[in-house]
């Protein structure tokens, strides 16, 4: 069973993200990755998921974002079960960067603003996100500034280092201004 996608992507604030007795196992696996996990995250506070490789940190994030569904247990945002939300509504709460962040063959500006095309004052918000992410230090390296094409699909495409792509992904996440990141 998959989430539906009905609504336009609007931003939502939240007060509490809660998981109760979460169990998740990958198909074909006997042992659950997460077994009876409970948590409560309050808005405005910082939390860190810490653990060994393979202990379920990324799995939990993907559960929270609706990419996976728990075998049992509930995840709620302000008391509403996320499985009752359509995918667009659920995604409006989150902004995340995974280990395999995306490299888009667009301009620098397009790479950043695609996370929130409806934002007002795009240039001002984009500049703030770029500076916070530490990507602005390379701005002088790009002949066309934020209009520089990235990637190898374009003849004039500029290639970025892994670290530069990572900072660009962080700028994209910050530009989105989601309540949970």
Regions found by a protein language model. Name each.
Residues 2-12:
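Pre-NBD coupling/linker segments of ABC/ABC-like ATPases
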Residues 10-181:
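ABC-type nucleotide-binding domain
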């Amino acid at each position: 069973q998959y989430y539906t996608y009905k609504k336009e992507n609007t931003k939502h604030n939240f007060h509490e993200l809660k998981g109760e007795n979460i169990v998740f196992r990958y198909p074909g696996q006997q042992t659950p990755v997460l077994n009876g996990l409970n948590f409560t995250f309050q808005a405005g506070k910082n939390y860190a998921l810490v653990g060994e490789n393979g202990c379920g940190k990324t799995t939990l994030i993907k559960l929270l974002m609706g990419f996976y569904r728990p075998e049992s247990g509930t995840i709620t945002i302000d008391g509403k079960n996320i499985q009752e939300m359509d995918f667009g509504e659920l995604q409006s709460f989150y902004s995340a960067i995974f280990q395999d962040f995306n490299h888009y063959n667009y301009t620098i500006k397009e790479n950043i603003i695609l996370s929130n095309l409806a934002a007002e004052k795009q240039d001002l918000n984009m500049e703030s996100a770029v500076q916070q992410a530490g990507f602005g230090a390379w701005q002088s390296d790009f002949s066309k500034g934020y209009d520089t094409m990235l990637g190898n699909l374009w003849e004039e495409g500029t290639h970025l280092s892994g670290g530069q792509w990572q900072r660009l992904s962080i700028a994209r996440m910050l530009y989105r201004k989601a309540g949970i990141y």
